């Protein structure tokens, strides 16, 4: 996802000299093509994320479109007050970019486990939250995000994620959800890089004779209400999957929306329970430990369908 982000950003920077990227002293292996090509549109704010965010807000007030870039919780939780007071409150044209949503940096411990970010950023008035599931979605979302007024949050994986869509996504318009696979028995809704596990779970369910529809939500605030309403009329069971706490995140957004609609379907949320991730390990290891890998998604879905 990181490489897809850089490619898309460079295409936009060529068209708009006001586009500015501010990094918190990292990401140089990925961002090097950007700063070498557009040195006047690149700032290294150092390991000072609060200052980075305040700087971005100030630059945005001069008419620039500014992106802040860091890993894990550092561009979000570490500077949430600056995002709230300096950026979102003023509708500043700042796009907060997190590389490493969920357990991407799992081996570095809970300080680097980004499992509350979507809920916190979703709660800020006026902030748009983007959660692409594969590199194709990233490249489709970046130009849309840059055209979206005000403060936005872009939650990325790290790198090496497979392309799950058959090809580039043309003419994406937020918050449109994207169907990867049609099904008849259950709907699996996914937000973010956990999409790889959701698609794999659908394959496992197919082996059990269960037809699962897979829908990716590259934008969760605002959320695609029309798609949710349509799914609620077709499926008795809807399963949400996120590498994030089930409290206030994607699953919460789906529940809130369908409850307001008076939908009669059952909603089941897969993600972190209301606990901290106290285990250290690789991303896949932690997905397995917290029952959000493909096998767990399959097993839990089968159990719900049997109820």
Give the ranges of each region predicted by the language model.
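Thiamine diphosphate
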Residues: 1-155, 157-307
